[in-house]
Amino acid sequence: MSGIVVGVDGSGHSQRALEQAMKEAAIRHVPLTVLTVHEAVRGYYGHMTMYADDPDRTEEARKAAQAEVDEVLAGLDGPRPDSVTVTAVHGYPVEELINAGKDADMIVLGSRGAGGFTRLMMGSVSSQVPQHAHCPVIIVPPENRG
């Protein structure tokens, strides 16, 4: 998929990333793919455990992402992306974002600012995706950073 891929999870951080991705897609006149991942469960010690896909939960995640897109579009000043596609998948966020970005021009992610022990145990999508992505990755910092 060419264009821009943005990962969303319903957080304020992902909403900021979505806003930035919409602006980038509009400026560049490229399609925007909004990807939400119905996440596999993480085990107690940080090991991933994959459970069977639940189509109902994945569809709920897609609808939530669509609502987030609609909200951001409603408040967007200026140009809008030529097209916006919302996709929901089941899996591990880092892997799914890297796969979605294989043919993309850019990936946009929000930053939660996790650090220390949390990052060591769980890793961070915004720190792992740039290391393995096949395209440029923009990390949108938290609003209160400064």
Question: What is the predicted role of each segment?
Answer:
Residues S2-Y51, V84:
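Small/aliphatic-rich secondary-structure junction motif
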Residues I4, A21, L32, L97, ...:
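Hydrophobic structural packing positions in well-ordered secondary structure
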Residues H13, A74-I107, N144-G146:
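Structural beta-alpha unit
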Residues L35, T85-V89, I138:
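General small-molecule cofactor/ligand-binding pocket signal
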Residues T36, S111-R112, P141-P142:
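Short secondary-structure boundary segments
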Residues T49-D53, A104-D105:
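Short, hinge-like loop/turn segments at secondary-structure boundaries
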Residues A52-A67:
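A short acidic, glycine-rich active-site loop
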Residues M106-Q131, G146:
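Glycine-rich, Arg-bearing micro-motifs that act as flexible, cationic patches
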